[in-house]
Every structure is written in structure tokens, then in C-alpha cells.
Amino acid sequence: MVKFILKRIGTMIIAMFMIILITFTLMHSIPGGPFTNTKGVPEEVTQAMEAKYGLDQPMPVQFVKYLGSLLHGDFGSSYKYTGKTVNDFIATGAPVSAKLGLVTLVFVLLTSIPMGILAALKNGKWQDMLLMAIATIGVTIPSFVIASMLIYVFSFKLNVLPTFGLDSWKSYILPVIAMGGYSVSYLARLMRSSLLEVMGQDYIRTARAKGLTEFAVVTKHALRNALIPVITVLGPTVAGLLTGSFVVEKIFAIPGIGYYFVNSVTQRDYTTIMGVTIFFAAFLMAMVLLVDIFYCLIDPRIKFDA
């Protein structure tokens, strides 16, 4: 296992370097910059600001300096918010996104897995068709559309739920549903198809022939193997939920990482874009690694490929 983990960490380092290089190149290749097209600012002031942050230097020089800062844990200063660093945004935004993400993750797991199990056990019946119809709708509708519909119905029309912030338990309801809608639908469909496949295996028929109840067959024999495909996709799902949904956080004015990222994109705040991208990529890779390890532990038939 140690060799497997070390190999994956080496691969992650290479992938992270490529992500940093590509993102940095794209940010600095886009016409204009964080200080261009600013109304009422003389050209001399713009040039002075670019010189202050080293944006007047050749791109390779800027990249090497940026890598040096990253090695010291410094994501740089924000170009748009005086006195603020990207580390400040991550330090303040990550806990907010993580808190919202944990609530959403609990909602997703407690909803999607039972939905998938029930649909599989009622295969072909009205319960199955109803649940899969809901799941199909949830997969096809984007999160920002769901968020807008929820705000219109429950905030504007019924006036029963707040539309911004995370001040009370009620304020979690709309963003959690908007963020988790796709994941619930996708995992429910995956859980259903996986359980149906497992229920058709020979060892399940053998368990039934021994006189085990359907509940025992499902919980003791089928469910563990049926969860393996679900666990496989949990890595990116958990990473996406815990780091926040960019659009949903912006719509509900939740000051998480996604909220800062959207603002940085619209304002061309290069360092914030880079910092949030690197943070998200690193967290995603770490979650995928943890899921791979857990994947091998839950199914002894799978061996670590060192």
C-alpha cells in the first residue's frame, strides 16, 4: 500500500504542476489584465501597478517567481482587494464552503442511496418509474436553474425561506437542495443500476435458495458490492461539495470559495483565480486518492497496483 500511495502522490505532483502551468499560461494569455480598462485611471498609474506586482516582467520570470511563492505556501496578494491575500480568501471561504458542503453531502447520501435501493427493489413498478423520472429531471437541470426556481417559489411567492447567507438552519435548505440536486439524481441512478446488476449474480441466487429473507440478501450480500461504483465517484463528488458550488454560492451570496472565485473571474484577479484553482485541484486529488484506498479496502479482490 505504501508503494501505491507514493506512486499516486508522485503522479499528483506532476498533475498539479501541469495544472499550475496551464492555468497560469491561460490567465496571462488573455488580452488585457487586472488593471486595464479601468475607467478614470491614467496610463501611468496602470503601468505603476503592473510594475508593483511584476506583471511587466516576461511570463517565464513571473511563473518561476509564482512557483517560488507557492513552495512557501504563499498564493500571492489580491490585485483587486488592497491588503488582502489569496490565503485570506481561502482561510475565510474554505470553512464556509466546507460547512455547507458537509450538510449537502449528508443530504445527498441520505437521499440518493435509499432512492436507488428502493428503485432497484421495485424494478419496473410505479415507484421505480417515479423515482427515476425525478432523478432524470435532477440530472438534466443545471444547479443555477434549480436555485433560481427555488428562490422564486419559496422566497418570492411563499416567502418562507431566506435567499442569502447562512444565518440560520432555514438558510441552508435552498442552497443544499440546489447544490445536491444533481449528485442525488446521479448517485440514485448509479445505485439502482449497480444493485440490479449485483442482484442478478449467482451468489445472490444461492443466498435466496438457502432461505434467507430478502432483507438479509440485500443488506448482507448485495449492498456492499453494489456500493463499490458509488464509492468510486464519491471522490470528485465530495471534493466538489466541500469546496462549494461556484454558481450556487454566488446566487445565494454565500461567502465561500466559489463566491470569491466568481468575483475574481469577473474582475480578472489572476492570483485569486490561480489560488482557488490550485486549492480545488489539490483537494480533488486528495479525495480521489482516499477513495481509491477505501475502494481497495472495501473489496479485498482488488489489489494495489504499485
Q: PLM ranges: what are they?
A:
Residues 2-3, 94-127, 143, 166-306:
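Alpha-helical transmembrane segments of integral membrane proteins
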Residues 6-16:
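N-terminal signal-anchor/signal peptide hydrophobic helix marking the start
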Residues 12, 93, 97, 133-140, ...:
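Residue-level signal for discrete positions within transmembrane alpha-helices
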Residues 16, 20, 24-29, 144, ...:
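Membrane-embedded alpha-helical segments of multi-pass transporters/permeases
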Residues 16-64, 158-174:
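Hydrophobic alpha-helical transmembrane segments of membrane transport/permease proteins
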Residues 23-29, 66-68, 133-162, 180-182:
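Membrane-water interface segments at the C-terminal ends of transmembrane alpha-helices
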Residues 51-59, 75-83, 164, 187, ...:
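Membrane-interfacial helix-loop-helix junctions in multi-pass membrane proteins
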Residues 56-113:
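An internal, D/E-rich "acidic patch" concept
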